[in-house]
Every structure is written in structure tokens, then in C-alpha cells.
Amino acid sequence: MIAGTLPPPPVAGLMQFDLVSADPGRAVFSCRPDESAYNPIGAVHGGLVCALLDSVLGCALHSTLPQGRGYTSVEIKVNYLKAVRLSSGLLTATGTVVKSGTRVAFTEGVVTDASNATVATASSTLLVFDL
């Protein structure tokens, strides 16, 4: 996707996710949520932050897989540490692979706001399989 040879997935456009960088075992996404992502109490819905983390963690794992292998999330645990609002500015999500086996992988991620404050962290388990 960074080289422009693959299009971003449709969900990235819907949720305004941008792939910033990807290296083997690590990926960085950004997102600037707007009021369309607000929940009833005037903060960005936690589901957007969870989806951002799930996406960056999957991409981090994908960067390590050979052609013909895929993955799907089995479990994700998110810790919400600070409310996200328009004033939070650009969100940056970083995902890293902790361990990847032939069938299961473990990842960790963090989301920071424009002031570099951590707004959420996550750990995830992913199933790895042949396509």
C-alpha cells in the first residue's frame, strides 16, 4: 500500500485511516476523527479507536507474512486511557508484533494524540492461516 501498488481497504476510507509507515513487524497509521465519529456524550466513539488499533495491529502482522498467508483477529483487548475529541487532533496508532508463530500471533499497540498523550493501548491475538 505504501508503494501504491495495492489500494487501501475500503474501511480505511470510511474511518479516515491513513497508513503512515510499515516495516517488518511494525506499522503506523494516522486518523483525524471528526464529529461524525462522536458518541452521545460528545467524545469519539471507542469503536473507532478499537478499529484503528485492530487495523494497525493486523497490518504489523501482515508485514511479516509471506505471500499466500493471511490472518484474522481472534481477540483484542483495548485500554482507553483518555477521551478523544476534536481537540485531540491527529491520532497516531503504532502496532508491533510481539511473537508470530505458524498459527497464532501476538501484537501490541498504542494510540497517541497530537500532544503525544497516550489515549489507548491494546493487545491482540491473531490466527494465521493459508489463503
Predicted regions and their residues:
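Terminal targeting signals and extreme-terminal segments of soluble enzymes
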Residues: M1-L131
